[in-house]
């Protein structure tokens, strides 16, 4: 009896499957999918993948005025083997400062009310990737290129306090 019930349900299931197959035979007109991609074979190489910028020692005067620059330091990202590359676009990413989101936050546990500001050699500010700024574009002309920047520590809160003022900023470069 169980065998007959299983056999009948198996036949019923096969009938439903067969009906489903017959119902799907008219698929309509065929379509095309076009794929496109640009594959680059070369990008510049960086002289150093990690940079250390020693900002020295600075003194925080009280009362602290917002906008006061405490320390400035030039630094350069050196690119080599750039043949065939015409443009580099640099994005910098790190947590933005809570008092001024156009600047980079310092690591927790140290100085407060101070943020890191980065500008290119023309004075264009490099804003953290998640903020309202745009990446900075650099023209590449030749085998090597130097991307000149200036870092500065800036007071962003009148209640600024002293302490270690380290910041880690990740950067990425896109080439064209």
Swiss-Prot record:
**Alphabetized InterPro entries for the sequence:** Adhesion_dom_fimbrial, Adhesion_dom_fimbrial_sf, Adhesion_dom_sf, Bact_Fimbrial_Adh_Pro
Assigned GO CC terms: pilus
Report the source organism: Escherichia coli O157:H7
- Name of the protein this chain belongs to: Probable fimbrial subunit LpfE
Subcellular localization, as worded in the UniProt entry: Fimbrium
Give a yes or no for keyword 4Fe-4S in this entry.
no
> What Gene3D superfamilies does its record include?
Fimbrial-type adhesion domain
Query: Which family does the entry's similarity section mention?
Result: Belongs to the fimbrial protein family.
Induction line: Induced during the exponential growth phase.
Q: PANTHER family of this UniProt entry?
A: FIMBRIAL SUBUNIT ELFA-RELATED (PTHR33420), FIMBRIN-LIKE PROTEIN FIMI-RELATED (PTHR33420:SF12)
List keywords of the entry alphabetically: Fimbrium, Signal
The job of this chain, per UniProt, is described as:
Part of the lpfABCC'DE fimbrial operon. LP fimbriae may participate in the interaction with eukaryotic cells by assisting in microcolony formation.
Looking at the record's lineage, which domain of life comes first? Bacteria
Where mainly found? other
Which SUPFAM superfamilies does the protein's record reference?
Bacterial adhesins
GO terms for biological process, alphabetical: cell adhesion involved in single-species biofilm formation
> Which N-terminal residues, if any, form the signal peptide?
1-23
């Amino acid at each position: 009896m169980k065998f007959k019930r299983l056999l009948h349900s198996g036949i019923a299931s096969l009938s439903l499957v067969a009906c489903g197959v017959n119902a799907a035979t008219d698929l309509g007109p065929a379509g095309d999918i076009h794929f496109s991609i640009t594959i680059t074979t070369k990008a510049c190489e960086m002289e150093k993948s990690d940079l250390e910028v020693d900002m020295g020692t600075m003194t925080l005067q009280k009362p602290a005025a917002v906008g006061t620059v405490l320390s400035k330091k030039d630094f350069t990202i050196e690119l080599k083997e750039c043949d065939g590359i015409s443009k580099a676009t640099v994005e910098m990413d790190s947590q933005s400062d809570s008092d001024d989101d156009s600047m980079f936050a310092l690591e927790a546990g140290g100085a407060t009310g101070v943020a890191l500001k980065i500008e290119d050699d023309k004075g264009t500010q490099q804003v953290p990737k998640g903020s309202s700024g745009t990446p900075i574009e650099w023209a590449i002309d030749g085998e090597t290129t130097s991307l000149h920047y200036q870092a500065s520590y800036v007071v962003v809160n009148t209640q600024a306090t002293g302490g270690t003022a380290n910041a880690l900023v990740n950067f990425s470069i896109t080439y064209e």
